[in-house]
Amino acid sequence: YYHNKVVRIDNVDFILSTLWSKIPSVDEFAIQNGMNDYAQILYNKRRLIPQNINDEFERNLAFIKQSVMESDADKIVVVTHHLPTFAALDERHKGSVLNTAYATELGNYIADSRITAWIYGHSHHRTDLMIGNTHLVSNPLGYVFCGENTNFDDSAVIGV
């Protein structure tokens, strides 16, 4: 598992980070009380709180931006767990108070960047979209026991 690492393969830089989401203070209570993560995960030996997530988000985003800026590769692929835009959320979740636990709106940054592709997960929903010249794609299996993602494509290939 790589976190905040860059791996170069054939002049393509893969920038790998969790990219925790940015949780606005207005959403903190609902997210902390509405998601199991906050009851189950310890952060520095204490219960996880939204501020921990926001601190990690700032570190992750700074790493991604610095790595993109420093890259001299022909192509750049960013790989994150969390979604880099609300546009990638499943329609059934649009407007949910929990959305900022899954995604952060980086659309303007992505559109202005030289990132070739951005691969992400966490949503348990297959997506394929473009922001500027960047191809954003997710093909998660989701929770198998409940048949969550019937759109999963086990033969999917992402070309860069």
Residue ranges, per PLM feature:
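Structural signal for conserved beta-strand scaffold positions within catalytic alpha/beta enzyme cores
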Residues: 1-3, 16, 138
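A substrate-binding/cap region within the structured catalytic cores of diverse enzymes
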Residues: 3-9, 19
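Short His-Asn-centered micro-motif
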Residues: 4, 120-121
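Binuclear metal-dependent phosphoesterase catalytic core
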Residues: 7-8, 90, 97-116, 124-160
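Divalent metal-coordination and catalytic microenvironments
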Residues: 14, 81, 122, 136
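Active-site-proximal loop/helix segment associated with metal-binding centers of metalloenzymes
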Residues: 15-77, 84-93
